[in-house]
């Protein structure tokens, strides 16, 4: 990416009591992000993650991220869902992490790596337009969902994994889908095993040149979220595998800003997989709880 402009470093104020956090969003998928130089993943048990992610009594978020500098040009991204469960990977969290790691001067602007539990993710840091691009590990193309029968208005169901498992459901009209109900039923379908899966519903618009529409029921949040990065990648690969869309393909979620997927698709695997989308810092604050000695 030529012409990148590094965001200005965030000024450091006086010492604070508690944990300094950054609230970020990727297409409406929101996160609390912490600097791992000031805290450690070991201090964030499930109950504490749930507390800070609670939308009524905490900061409110779909997930928690801790960024920790590792080897040169590498940042460790630890991720938890809002229910306190650990997540191997989150695409929108990676986009947000790519921006904040540069702002916190963990790495210089340009290209660097995020180390996740789903593998190494290359990041192209964004300019001032609040966007970033991530290069994901090669993945198998989504396949027909095992023993999952499409309901009325559904064309097909595919199952894939982009760091975490994803169902992709092609529907006639995404606005008529009861995402909380249908998503919850598919997420815990016995055919998927005890871990279940995220569920993504996709439909085209009347203008086939317009972005595809996508809505997601997220495992670990156990609700519909405004966007899902890895789910968007799974959807793009499923559509490409069925030749319903060419790559790159762009999606619009309920969160607003678009996400674009590009990849090289072979007979059974996708290579050079990229996701481009928003990574925006909303505000920062201080979280005080019993762990901080309040």
Model-flagged regions — what are they?
Residues 2-128, 168-294:
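A glycine-rich beta-to-alpha transition motif near the start of alpha/beta enzyme domains, typified by
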Residues 27, 139, 165:
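Short glycine-rich anion-binding loops that position phosphate/pyrophosphate groups of nucleotides
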Residues 138-157, 184:
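Active-site glycine-rich loop that binds ribose-phosphate moieties when present
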Residues 149-178:
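Internal active-site segments that recognize and position negatively charged phosphoryl groups
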């Amino acid at each position: 990416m030529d012409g990148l402009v590094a965001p200005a470093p965030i000024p450091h104020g006086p010492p604070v009591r508690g944990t300094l956090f950054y609230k970020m969003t990727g297409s409406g998928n929101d996160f609390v992000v912490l600097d791992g130089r000031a805290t450690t993943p070991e201090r964030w048990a499930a109950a504490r993650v749930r507390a800070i992610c609670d939308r009524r009594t905490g900061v409110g978020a779909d997930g928690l991220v801790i960024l920790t500098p590792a080897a040169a040009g590498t940042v460790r991204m630890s991720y938890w869902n809002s229910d306190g469960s650990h997540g191997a990977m989150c695409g929108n969290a990676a986009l947000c992490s790519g921006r904040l790691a540069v702002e916190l001067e963990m790495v210089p602007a340009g290209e660097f790596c995020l180390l996740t539990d789903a593998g190494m993710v290359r990041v192209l840091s964004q300019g001032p337009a609040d966007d970033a691009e991530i290069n994901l590990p090669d993945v198998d193309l989504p396949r027909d969902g095992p023993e999952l029968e499409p309901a009325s208005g559904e064309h097909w169901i595919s199952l894939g994994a982009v760091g975490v498992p994803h169902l992709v459901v092609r529907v006639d009209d995404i606005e008529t889908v009861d995402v909380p109900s249908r998503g919850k039923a598919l997420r815990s379908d016995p055919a998927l095993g005890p871990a279940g899966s995220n569920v993504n519903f996709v439909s085209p618009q009347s203008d086939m040149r317009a972005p595809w529409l996508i809505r997601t029921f997220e495992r670990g949040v156990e609700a519909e979220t405004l966007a899902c990065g890895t789910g968007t990648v799974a959807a793009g690969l499923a559509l490409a595998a069925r030749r319903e869309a060419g790559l790159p393909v762009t999606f619009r979620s309920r969160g607003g800003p678009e996400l674009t997927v590009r990849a090289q698709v072979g007979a059974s695997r996708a290579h050079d997989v990229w996701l481009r989308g928003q990574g925006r810092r909303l505000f920062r604050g201080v979280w005080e709880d019993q762990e901080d000695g309040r």
